[in-house]
């Protein structure tokens, strides 16, 4: 049972809100260059 308590304690200490916010910022940050790349590849025709 000791290892399970350790895992539960580890998961309860993780701040999932910060992880979600950083994930969203990364997705938004990647979306900009992706749009520019698509515009360049398709010669401006989205």
UniProtKB/Swiss-Prot annotation:
Entry's Gene Ontology BP terms: photosynthesis
Cell compartments where the protein resides: Cellular thylakoid membrane
Knockout-associated phenotype: No visible growth effect at 10 umol or 60 umol photons/m(2)/s, loss of the PsbY subunit from PSII, no change in O(2) evolution under medium light, increased susceptibility to photodamage, cytochrome b559 (PsbE and PsbF) is in a low potential state in isolated thylakoids.
Topology in the lipid bilayer: Single-pass membrane protein
Transmembrane segments: 21-38
Chief place where the protein resides: membrane
Coiled coil: none
Family in the record: Belongs to the Psb30/Ycf12 family.
Protein's job: A core subunit of photosystem II (PSII). PSII is a light-driven water plastoquinone oxidoreductase, using light energy to abstract electrons from H(2)O, generating a proton gradient subsequently used for ATP formation. Helps stabilize PSII.
HAMAP family to which the protein is assigned, alphabetical: PSII_Psb30_Ycf12
This protein's name: Photosystem II reaction center protein Psb30
Natural source organism: Thermosynechococcus vestitus (strain NIES-2133 / IAM M-273 / BP-1)
């Amino acid at each position: 049972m000791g290892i399970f308590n350790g895992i539960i304690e580890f998961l309860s200490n993780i701040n999932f809100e910060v992880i979600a916010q950083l994930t969203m910022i990364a997705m938004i940050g990647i979306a900009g260059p992706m749009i520019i790349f698509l515009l360049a590849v398709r010669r401006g025709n989205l």
